[in-house]
Amino acid sequence: MIKTYQYRSILNSRNVGIRFLKTLSPSPHSKDPNSKSIFDIGTKLIVNPPPQMADNQYVTHPLFPHPKYSDEDCEAVHFVHREPKTIGDKIADRGVKFCRASFDFVTGYKKPKDVNGMLKSWEGTRYEMTEEKWLTRCIFLESVAGVPGMVAAFIRHLHSLRLLKRDKAWIETLLDEAYNERMHLLTFIKIGNPSWFTRFIIYMGQGVFANLFFLVYLIKPRYCHRFVGYLEEEAVSTYTHLIKDIDSKRLPKFDDVNLPEISWLYWTDLNEKSTFRDLIQRIRADESKHREVNHTLANLEQKKDRNPFALKVEDVPKEQQPDEYSLKTPHPEGWNREQMRL
């Protein structure tokens, strides 16, 4: 009898603990609007941004004007993976995969086996993606993606000052990348309002990632650019999944979203009638370009070679000189050094 009583007490204690944990952290795929938690990582969707969110008094002309992308070029963007060849490549690739797997587990996301093909439905499971979960994922991704370009540009800026010489146009492209990623984030936060816990994760993530990236870039900048190249591959994969979900009518709330003014002021080929899908297409196209740029920079001699995307050389054929803005590239996985005339 004593053993039976003890066993029941343990079961009751376990049930109480489980109910308490569910209160703190409801199921990631729960659609109950009243399901709240102090650890909620959901993002509230803003269909019609109120006028006070416009921030028009702070808007300036873009420091790096965005090129115009055609719908056809944006549709043609697809997931491409650069196979790791060196030990540094493998470390960078596995590092990105580890970070992504950890974030996927926390947010209840599962990567489709074929991001370019038909998606498997995970309705009714923790992997079902809702509009709120997608916004959380996009906001966190862009808060991280804006760090590497600025950190790398800062280090190269100091390097140029210290050695009293030019940096051969690396800084401009890196600053452009950081600015572009920040515009992605500024646009998303007009569409979604993240929870305080999501903001806390962003604060902590930026503090750790920015300092770690800074230290590694001082020692091995090539590894850092390769890491960012693989990170951008995952960004293209994520946005491709999002577009597929929109096309499959799994995210009906996004059909009613009115794009904020900041979006068409930056992407000049958008307007007030553009859809959320149009915006995601442009953002995915940007990420694909960052993928090409960083994989290419990782293939260069870090202290000797010019940045071929920004510093052009006359009389060099187009097939041997990357274009900084064109999406029609023969090497979306990055240019090898021998494919360019430096």
Swiss-Prot record:
The chain crosses the membrane at residues 135-155, 200-220. Its EC number is 1.-.-.-. Residues 308-342 are annotated as: Disordered. Fe cation 1 binds at residues 142, 181, 184, 287. Its cofactor is Fe cation. The keyword Phosphoprotein does not apply. One of its GO terms (biological process) is alternative respiration. Residues 1-20 form a transit peptide. Fe cation 2 binds at residues 181, 232, 287, 290. Keywords: Disulfide bond, Electron transport, Iron, Membrane, Metal-binding, Mitochondrion, Mitochondrion inner membrane, Oxidoreductase, Respiratory chain, Transit peptide, Transmembrane, Transmembrane helix, Transport. Residues 308-321, 330-342 have a biased composition (Basic and acidic residues). It is a multi-pass membrane protein. Binds 2 iron ions per subunit. It is found in: Mitochondrion inner membrane. The keyword Oxidoreductase applies. GO terms for cellular component: mitochondrial inner membrane. InterPro entries: AOX, AOX_sf. One of its GO terms (molecular function) is alternative oxidase activity. Homodimer; disulfide-linked. Catalyzes cyanide-resistant oxygen consumption. May increase respiration when the cytochrome respiratory pathway is restricted, or in response to low temperatures. Belongs to the alternative oxidase family. This is Alternative oxidase, mitochondrial. It comes from Wickerhamomyces anomalus. The lineage of its organism: Eukaryota, Fungi, Dikarya, Ascomycota, Saccharomycotina. The gene is AOX1.
